[in-house]
Amino acid sequence: LWAIPLAFSLLTSSCSDYLDKLPENTVEVEGIDYTNKSNMYMPVSGVYATARGYLGSWSSYGCIIVRGDDVNKGGSPTDQIEYEYASKFQYDRLTTFWALSGLWGNCYYVVSTSNSALESLENYAKHLTSESDKQLNAQYAAEVRFFRAYAYFQLVNLFGDVPLLLDNQELNVFKNTKEDVKK
């Protein structure tokens, strides 16, 4: 009887590389040709796509705009109570609000993507020779830094002191003051 499960496990296991494929829309870091300047915009495009998808979501947007005078949450004070607290900056009462914790993760996803893009742009910059290509690289880096700064702007406005990650190599992360983040 023990031979049947053993035979079945041997027949169903395989040495194929079917599961070792890269996810779609990804590139191995080792496979990037940083001498091909026509690909230099790709990491920037990734940041735009990430920012659009993660900072432009309806849940994130609700947490951001309800704090100003752009919109009122409407309804009674107990209707969507989380947005009522957010509009009054009472974030200590929102410790389990899914949209707020989602915004935290979304902002740091933009930060992480931006850090990776800046690292790629630095690698492209090492191989650029013409002044116009160097200026274009600097422009792309500025666009990426804008999105990272915008994500941090939202983070410090919502949470106060937050970890400042300027690269994706940090292992020990600590909170930085709002003032340090805004520099």
Give each language-model segment a name:
Residues 1-13:
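Sec-dependent bacterial lipoprotein signal peptides
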Residues 15-66:
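Membrane-proximal, proline-rich intrinsically disordered regions
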Residues 21-22, 156-167:
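Short, well-structured active-site flanking segments
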Residues 22, 71-72, 94:
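Intrinsically disordered, low-complexity regions of eukaryotic proteins
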Residues 25-29, 130-134, 166-173:
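Short linear capping/connector segments at secondary-structure termini
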Residues 29, 67-73, 78, 109, ...:
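Primarily recognizes Gram-negative and organellar outer-membrane beta-barrels
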Residues 58-72, 76, 156, 163:
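Short, solvent-exposed turn/loop segments enriched in Gly/Ser/Thr/Pro and often Arg
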